[in-house]
UniProtKB/Swiss-Prot annotation:
<dbReference type="GO" id="GO:0016853">
    <property type="term" value="F:isomerase activity"/>
</dbReference>
<dbReference type="InterPro" id="IPR027409">
    <property type="entry name" value="GroEL-like_apical_dom_sf"/>
</dbReference>
<dbReference type="InterPro" id="IPR001844">
    <property type="entry name" value="Cpn60/GroEL"/>
</dbReference>
<keyword id="KW-0143">Chaperone</keyword>
<feature type="region of interest" description="Disordered">
    <location>
        <begin position="520"/>
        <end position="541"/>
    </location>
</feature>
<dbReference type="InterPro" id="IPR027413">
    <property type="entry name" value="GROEL-like_equatorial_sf"/>
</dbReference>
<feature type="binding site">
    <location>
        <position position="413"/>
    </location>
    <ligand>
        <name>ATP</name>
    </ligand>
</feature>
<keyword id="KW-0413">Isomerase</keyword>
<dbReference type="GO" id="GO:0005737">
    <property type="term" value="C:cytoplasm"/>
</dbReference>
<protein>
    <recommendedName>
        <fullName>Chaperonin GroEL 1</fullName>
        <ecNumber>5.6.1.7</ecNumber>
    </recommendedName>
</protein>
<comment type="function">
    <text>Together with its co-chaperonin GroES, plays an essential role in assisting protein folding. The GroEL-GroES system forms a nano-cage that allows encapsulation of the non-native substrate proteins and provides a physical environment optimized to promote and accelerate protein folding.</text>
</comment>
<dbReference type="GO" id="GO:0051082">
    <property type="term" value="F:unfolded protein binding"/>
</dbReference>
<dbReference type="InterPro" id="IPR027410">
    <property type="entry name" value="TCP-1-like_intermed_sf"/>
</dbReference>
<feature type="binding site">
    <location>
        <begin position="478"/>
        <end position="480"/>
    </location>
    <ligand>
        <name>ATP</name>
    </ligand>
</feature>
<keyword id="KW-0963">Cytoplasm</keyword>
<dbReference type="GO" id="GO:0042026">
    <property type="term" value="P:protein refolding"/>
</dbReference>
<comment type="similarity">
    <text>Belongs to the chaperonin (HSP60) family.</text>
</comment>
């Protein structure tokens, strides 16, 4: 396929146009008075959403050079979403402002590399300042406030706050679809750990990129599983039982893995393979915990249990298993209450006698996993479209709440960024030339999220930004009430992790665009003589 190349200014201009198109589509959703965007899907009904990353994912531009810019900004949104689960619109708006101001300076002769370095230094300084100014979050009420801001729904906020307090900060909160119209919270016995599926082919729900197994069997295996003849006899028995299978082992590889994958693709046997978490003795101990929770046995040749000889009797069970790329949650395992209580007692006794802090901490983590259970938020709605949107909102809210517990919160509404600008003063005195210019570019971009929150609320963005920059540190503009004041008191707060990710990711993408000298794209395949192409219509008949 032949390529098409653009250089310097032309390349950067086209990329900027793409950045603008994507950011303009997303930024109308910013803030409590943000609007919705309707996405027409190639199949199924249209989706209505106000979630930045969902909109960004749908956008592909016709002009290949503009599309490069759009895809770069899309990566800002997705990165921020992966780390913090929220803040994608803020990140997109920041990136747009940085690209705009940065390109103006490059066009005027600034050195893009130095400019980019200045932007990066400024981003780090602001990120540090945000972290330093964060307030820790502990109680259900403030966790609930974070979730309310994220989902724009007080009921959801309360449920998430309650869920997080019930299962503890290490506990697992999952989101399911409810069969009724109500959204409610259920706390069940369950256990989660930080290992996801070994292969993406195991995904069963493509929207959420998760593998969901209902009423599943669970195989726990101490060592690696690689040979197919070892696994096959058991697989055949599981297939006869007609139930999905979760495999937790040191690793699953080779023929064994490819057979599972082929079965998953053909849908002949629903199975998901996951690596057991931790190493060495901790891994052994955790597998034993899982055996207690699921009511199964760990298959281990050392105790005479050999994979190719065992039957269904060694398998545990679970009402539901949800696996994504980073984590596995087992809900309602088949282990008896007595066995689980016995195991907890044993762990507590070990904690008592342990003389090493590290061991004690790890034992306490295991106990928390066993005792914590899993909070399931069941989301209900009247229509399919509504359900999708609500479920997405609840998932974002849970992610935001977790981020808040991890690193604390800062004031929301774009105000924290405006106030964090003061952290750039020390850089201003030590940098010079185009690096200093980069810091100024960054300083000017910091107010862009607040500008759009105010604009979406129907006010003059510049006036609001000006006013907020004169307020003391904890104060800002509340776009829901259209008043200025103490935002933490009003519950207008963001997890600092979200705000920091937005700052860092926006800066890294802006640097990429600014330092682009050449853009190479596939030449679009064209119908004969329709006069498109990058020259934009040469045929003036």
């Amino acid at each position: 396929m032949s390529k098409q190349i653009e250089f310097n200014e032309t390349a950067r201009r086209a990329m900027e146009a793409g950045v603008d198109k994507l950011a303009d589509a997303v930024k109308v959703t910013l803030g409590p008075r943000g609007r919705h965007v309707v996405l027409a899907k190639s199949w199924g009904g249209p989706t209505v959403t106000n979630d930045g990353v969902t909109i960004a994912r749908e956008i592909d531009l016709e002009d290949p050079f503009e599309n490069l810019g759009a895809q770069l900004v899309k990566s800002v949104a997705t990165k921020t979403n992966d780390v913090a689960g929220d803040g994608t619109t803020t990140a997109t708006v920041l990136a747009q402002a940085l690209v705009k101001a940065g390109l103006r300076n490059v066009a005027a002769g600034a050195n893009p590399i130095a400019l980019g370095a200045g932007i990066a230094k400024a981003a780090d300084a602001v990120s540090e300042a945000l972290l330093a100014s964060a307030t820790p979050v502990k109680d259900a009420k403030s966790i609930g406030q974070v979730a309310t801001v994220s989902s724009r729904d007080e009921l959801v906020g309360e449920l998430v706050g309650e869920a997080m307090t019930k299962v503890g900060t290490d506990g697992v909160v999952t989101v399911e679809e409810s069969s009724t119209l109500n959204t409610e919270l259920e706390v069940t016995e369950g256990v989660g750990f930080d290992k996801g599926f070994i292969s993406a082919y195991f995904v069963t729900d493509f929207d959420s990129q998760e593998a969901v197994l209902e009423d599943a069997l669970v195989l726990l295996h101490r060592e690696k599983i690689s040979s197919l003849p070892d696994l096959l006899p058991l697989l055949e028995k599981v297939a006869e039982a007609g139930k999905p299978l979760l495999i937790v082992a040191e690793d699953v590889e080779g023929e064994a893995l490819s057979t599972l994958v082929v079965n998953a693709i053909r849908k002949t046997l629903k199975a998901v393979a996951v690596k057991a978490p931790f190493f060495g003795d901790r891994r052994k101990a955790f597998l034993d915990d899982l055996a207690v929770v699921t009511g199964g046995q760990v298959v281990n040749p050392d105790v005479g249990l050999v994979l190719r000889e065992v039957g269904l009797e060694v398998l545990g069970t679970a009402r539901r298993v949800v696996v994504d790329k980073d984590s596995t949650v087992i809900v309602d395992g088949g282990g008896t209450q007595d066995a689980i209580e016995g195991r907890k007692g044993q762990l507590r006794a070990e904690i008592e006698v342990s003389d090493s802090d590290w061991d004690r901490e790890k034992l306490e983590e295991r106990l928390a996993k066993l005792a914590g259970g899993v909070a399931v938020i069941k989301v209900g709605a009247a229509t399919e479209t509504d359900l999708k949107k609500r479920k997405e909102a609840v998932e974002d809210a849970v992610a935001a709440a977790k981020a808040a517990v991890e690193e604390g919160i800062v004031i929301g509404g774009g105000a924290a960024l405006v106030h964090a600008g003061s952290a750039l003063d020390s850089l201003r005195s030590e940098l010079k030339g185009d690096e200093l210019l980069g810091v100024e570019v960054f300083a000017s971009a910091l107010s862009s999220p607040l500008y759009w929150i105010a604009t979406n609320a129907g006010l003059d963005g510049a006036v609001v930004v000006n006013k907020v920059s004169e307020l003391p540190a904890g104060q800002g503009f509340n776009a829901a009430t259209l008043e200025y004041g103490d935002l933490i008191g009003d519950g207008v707060i963001d997890p600092v992790k979200v705000t920091r990710s937005a700052v860092v990711n926006a800066a890294s993408v802006a640097r990429m665009v600014l330092t682009t000298e050449t853009a190479v794209v596939e030449k679009p395949a064209e119908a004969e003589d329709d006069g498109h192409g990058h020259g934009h219509g040469h045929h003036h008949h």
